[in-house]
Amino acid sequence: MYQTVRPLLFRLDAEDAHHLTLRGLELASGVPLLPRLARTLTVPGTQGPGDAALRRTLWGQTPSEQTFESPLGLAAGLDKNAQAVPAFTAFGFGFVEVGTVTPLAQSGNERPRLFRLPEDEALINRMGFNNGGTAAMHARLAVLTDRAAPVWVNIGKNKVTPNEDAAEDYRKCVRALGDLADAFVVNVSSPNTPGLRALQAADDLAALVRAVLDEVEAGRVRTLRRPPVLVKLAPDLHPADFEASVGAVLDAGASGLIISNTTLSRGGLSHPNREQAGGLSGRPLTDRSTELVRDAYRLTRGQVPIVGVGGVFSAEDAYAKLLAGADLVEVYSALIYRGPGLVREINAGLVKLLERDGVRNIADVVGQG
């Protein structure tokens, strides 16, 4: 069905099509029982045997423990304001990452700021953290009392906040959403907020992560919860800087890594939109992000979970990242090109790959490639 609708959507400006689709998903999310019923058709095992094959538990035996019915999640950026979480979980995602959210609402960069590269199965965006702020997100998350999957919140700083004060913006996000977020993702790697990537420098990153963790601990008295804190890194770091940043994340006590954000690289692209400024996502990142996952797994020695994201268009792509060391994987750009049915396709494909390799649970392939 999506392949019939896609040509119509692709006639629209990319951001207009995004808003139209998201509005439809928001309306579907509000239909009682519909998202949960749809989920029984999209998550392997909800209707029959072998339902444990894709199930993962991370941060076990701690206040941060979470269970995922599938290792496949929605990457941040598609549902910036948590408008359609029930619909996305109905697709079959094992978790949903919303945001990036900043303490105050902001409009982001000027349009046009989102571009398709169909021949390359890629997107370029320079959105600039456009979002409705933490208060609006809190109101939306507060009504999701019966969540089918964990909801992670990707947090950032407002554009007007200088880097020396950035930690307070991240703390404000945690303070505002700590009672509702199942995890926080510290975004210091978007290329579309001036100076943001400088916060990936090891010393600055360690200080920022500690500030976020301090806020999480301070909130435990009020919320009785301790959501894990993950850090999302860029794919464009020099290898030595990447190693230093990963080490800083570990030393500061973060709970995991997301590898990786969009890239500024333009190698091998054919579409004219390759000249647009912004972060590139999609198929061109498939191999690069998988290699970075492998590097991160080697550097961390499997001490913390890794989420692999970048160019996941098939079960084989997801499986490659798991073999490289990812515990979970995320998709975004592939949804634009393949549609929501891709989620079920990847889930079912992962089950078949496990059966082919004689593996009972997805956890047993992590880091084995």
From Swiss-Prot:
Primary subcellular site in the record, as a coarse category: membrane
Reaction equation(s) it catalyzes: (S)-dihydroorotate + a quinone = orotate + a quinol
InterPro entries on file: Aldolase_TIM, DHO_dehydrogenase, Dihydroorotate_DH_2, Dihydroorotate_DH_cat, Dihydroorotate_DH_CS
Entry's localization field: Cell membrane
Example of a GO cellular component annotation carried by this entry: plasma membrane
SUPFAM superfamilies associated with the record: FMN-linked oxidoreductases
Cofactor details (free text): Binds 1 FMN per subunit.
Binding positions (FMN): A76, G77, L78, D79, K80, T100, N154, N187, K232, S260, G282, G311, Y332, S333
One Pfam assignment: DHO_dh
Gene3D superfamilies: Aldolase class I
Keyword NAD (UniProt): no
Keywords, ordered alphabetically: Cell membrane, Flavoprotein, FMN, Membrane, Oxidoreductase, Pyrimidine biosynthesis
Cofactor: FMN
Function according to Swiss-Prot or TrEMBL: Catalyzes the conversion of dihydroorotate to orotate with quinone as electron acceptor.
Family (UniProt): Belongs to the dihydroorotate dehydrogenase family. Type 2 subfamily.
Protein name (Swiss-Prot/TrEMBL): Dihydroorotate dehydrogenase (quinone)
Native organism: Deinococcus radiodurans (strain ATCC 13939 / DSM 20539 / JCM 16871 / CCUG 27074 / LMG 4051 / NBRC 15346 / NCIMB 9279 / VKM B-1422 / R1)
